[in-house]
């Protein structure tokens, strides 16, 4: 007899490459995003969890990235 328990699974992950992110969000340039990623430990992006590395591939969690962007705006006040 199998025990089928409903476990909480995130409904969706919005992971995209840097290039895909920039194509979808034209306000951001490829170089600009890469600069943010390069400095992620200094600008708080690393703590946000928005950048995911799988081997050499760098993926961006769009939801977490935009939460981080919004927190940067709130911190500027």
Where are these regions (language model features)?
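A short, Lys/Arg-enriched interface patch at domain edges and termini
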Residues: 62-77
């Amino acid at each position: 007899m199998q025990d089928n328990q409903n476990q909480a699974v995130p409904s969706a992950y919005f992971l995209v490459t840097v290039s895909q992110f920039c194509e979808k969000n034209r306000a951001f340039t490829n170089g600009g995003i890469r600069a943010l990623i390069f400095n992620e430990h200094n600008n708080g992006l690393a703590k946000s969890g928005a950048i995911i590395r799988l081997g050499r591939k760098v993926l961006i969690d769009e939801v977490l990235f935009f939460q981080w962007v919004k927190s940067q705006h709130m911190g500027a006040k």
